[in-house]
Amino acid sequence: YLCSAEIYQGANHYGRYLTHGSMQLLADGDPVSAFGSGFRQEGWDWRHIPGTTALEIPMERMKADIRNVDTASGYEEMLLSDEAFAGGVSHRGRDGVFAMELHEHDKYNGSLRARKSWFFFDNRIVCMGSDIENKAEGGVHTTLFQNFLADAADPLVVNGEAVTQFPYRAELAGGAVLRDNLRNAY
């Protein structure tokens, strides 16, 4: 079974979506690192971890409540999903596939479900989500990317048009091509 997140009394209180299909591109830095690839703690929105399919909830509802765990566990939270399917294979460390079935634990919602798949070909990644459902109040979203923006003048490119407006929000219909401030295309 999948452990949905490791949350302790003094650590990771907002990490409940880490196992909802997170995938962060690490391609920059010398050596390549999370920091060099756009991750910074300051400004990070834990509701939008790259790759995750998650509920649209206010930040106040994100903090884990670990007071009601069983007496044997102590002050920690390691909730198990009732889904047991997750796995992947690779070919020569270059091409591969990973898939998982997501079911959020009943403590937080219990009705959020999805099937997620990633296909890795050369320098391309194809991410697919299907059978996404949620019976609880509020919407569901899948986050493509979240990067630290060191300079607001670094453009996001949407369908070939540079966007320097910050913050920026748009709803795109049909096919779209996005390029983040680190030159990763989606």
Features from the language model and the residues they span:
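Catalytic and substrate-binding regions of extracellular carbohydrate-active enzymes
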Residues: Y1-G175, R179-A185
